[in-house]
């Protein structure tokens, strides 16, 4: 026989099943069962929706319903809490990743600035020293650049569409390129040397085992020209043009033990102006592109813009004019502007040429020799063609 609940004569009180397991303030979509207070006069009916109706109630059923609703409410609360925790963890991970990226960029920027200043001071001292010091430094840079170039040629991106030269021949060509600046200092010109080297390399390619490819010959000849022959013009400019620059203030105050006024030759002044112009061109182009860059310059280098290029041109010409006034060369303003324009175009053309090679190779940097700057070829690409233009300008303009 089912248990009964006796009803007293007092006013019944509403009771929700959800109130058995949760706070009474919580609203519930379920219907209410009104459980009256205890009395001895009546058997135990229940009031449903304020109507006096005898209902047989099993205490286990009430407990099961209350327990099920409690579990459902607890699961909903736990799921919401887990979702909030996951969201907070995701936000924390995103914030930490942003902090890591900012810290990495700051560290990269510090490396670039530190090594950039170190390289700049070292190059300045080498240029001022001239002679064998300058020539050996150029030869070392040429050797490293040639090795990086031939590694780019052998990379997957370029090698898929062509047959690269054999590795032993790439090493031989790198050594030949490094010897060219030294031969330039000793003989004054390397026309016969470069012709002989090109002939020997071409014969080695044609007589190799297997089927020789034109791509091997073309990439090797371009490597000799790009990495070996063109940098030799810096040696010819610094060490070959020995006429002193007159009326220069820094030359008159230069210590006699370091060569005196005769140390400041046309070649030294021209190379200092060219180097500073290239640095100004790269710096102003970078800053101008960051601030005003909208129109892409060329597809092989998507980050370069016309606005940045114009800023680089203005910066190169401005630095050239300032240095020409302090170093008293060139004398005329028109010649100074022309020299600045040549330095700018040589810098841009060299940069774009190396960008084309890296794009075909499918790499971002030519190497990882210099922390924060990439390889040596990434640092000297703007100087490769500029040396030939600067030397030609000085020879045509006259000392």
UniProtKB/Swiss-Prot annotation:
Q: Keyword annotations for this protein? A: Chloroplast, Lipid biosynthesis, Lipid metabolism, Magnesium, Membrane, Nucleotidyltransferase, Phospholipid biosynthesis, Phospholipid metabolism, Plastid, Transferase, Transit peptide, Transmembrane, Transmembrane helix
EC nos? 2.7.7.41
- Activity regulation behaviour: Highest activities is obtained at about 30 mM CTP and 2 mM phosphatidic acid (PA).
Cofactor remark? Requires a divalent cation for activity. Displays highest activities with MgCl(2).
* One GO biological process term: phosphatidylglycerol biosynthetic process
UniProt family annotation: Belongs to the CDS family.
Name of this chain's protein: Phosphatidate cytidylyltransferase 5, chloroplastic
Species whose genome carries this gene = Arabidopsis thaliana (Mouse-ear cress)
Question: Taxonomic lineage of this organism?
Answer: Eukaryota, Viridiplantae, Streptophyta, Embryophyta, Tracheophyta
Record gene name: CDS5
